[in-house]
Amino acid sequence: MVRAKRKLDHIEYALSTGQSRTHGFHDIDFVHQSLPNSSYETITCETKIGELSLSSPIFINAMTGGGGEKTLHINEQLAYVAKHHNLAMAVGSQMAALKDESEAASYKIIRKVNPNGIFFANLGSEATVEQAELAVDMIEANALQIHLNVIQELTMPEGDRDFTGVLQRIEKIVLNSKVPVIVKEVGFGMSKETMQQLASVGVTAIDIGGQGGTNFAAVENERRQRMLSYFNNWGIQTATSIIEATSTNNNLSFIASGGIQTALDVAKAIALGANTTAFAGYFLRILMEDGIEKLVDEIDLLHTDLKFIMTALGAKTIEELQSVPLVVKGETYHWLTQRGIDTTHYSRR
């Protein structure tokens, strides 16, 4: 019951605290192309995360589940939207259903709505190999997300306080998983060092989950009597984290998430090196406040606008979009300079 109540609290406070939009994409400028030699009608948006092929560089990221009828209904609607647009979709942490079997329906509903969809299971880094297998089987998942949420847990009144052995548990899951494993942050970004550690234990896909979207420190602080306000601005911005990711030179696929709301955000994230992008809080707000048809329409517009931007840049495919010239400036540039990461290759390609 406590876990289910927390799931509902997260939805309420995620909506009320909103998205900070401090993602850093304002520091990224495309170099205009007056002769793009492209046609809107020939633009294609297919992409891949590792060996997993996706029809769009936009997918519905982990939001909820395990909170009774309300979360079941949300996942049901999101699965419908995913089916309509042929998008991949992740569910929220399934630990609730592993602890209480009655909550499994709030996750299984997605497969009923969209039998042939691409779905990602989701568990925290405390999960065992056996729990990971159960989560994947529960929704017949195509991949498994393992989320890292140290700051959220520390801010959460009833959260974890011990984070030893996480990398070793992830390694065991990677070695034993029958589906690809994606390790993700939840809005605090990832450093290049973290990603190098993950790559060293066999992780091949990372969702950088940067600062700039739903702020789970702020969400958990709403649930506390004494706020840990020093965590409210903690983290690495999304744009910065993507560049840190690409600087590792590992054979990794990257998902960009964290405050992404527009087609321009998507285009910039991919041009910086992401393979795909993920939306959560922005889609949830539209669904809850404006309804499912409005969300369907918004995703249509995102795809249209992304193709307009790609046409302007002369990028006919997502792979070509990853090679267009851009300039990194402002606070993002200064951060990366201090971190010893050269950004001039973006502007000179």
Curated annotation (Swiss-Prot):
Its main location: cytoplasm. It catalyses: isopentenyl diphosphate = dimethylallyl diphosphate. Its cofactor is FMN; NADPH; Mg(2+). It comes from the Bacteria. One of its GO terms (cellular component) is cytoplasm. FMN binds at residues 62-64, 93, 122, 184, 214, 258-259, 280-281. GO terms for molecular function: FMN binding; isopentenyl-diphosphate delta-isomerase activity; magnesium ion binding; NADPH binding; oxidoreductase activity. It is found in: Cytoplasm. It is an enzyme of class 5 (isomerase). It holds the Pfam family FMN_dh. Its EC number is 5.3.3.2. Keywords: Cytoplasm, Flavoprotein, FMN, Isomerase, Isoprene biosynthesis, Magnesium, Metal-binding, NADP. Substrate binds at residues 6-7, 152. Mg(2+) binds at residue 153. The keyword Cytoplasm applies. GO terms for biological process: isoprenoid biosynthetic process. Homooctamer. Dimer of tetramers. Belongs to the IPP isomerase type 2 family. Involved in the biosynthesis of isoprenoids. Catalyzes the 1,3-allylic rearrangement of the homoallylic substrate isopentenyl (IPP) to its allylic isomer, dimethylallyl diphosphate (DMAPP). This is Isopentenyl-diphosphate delta-isomerase.
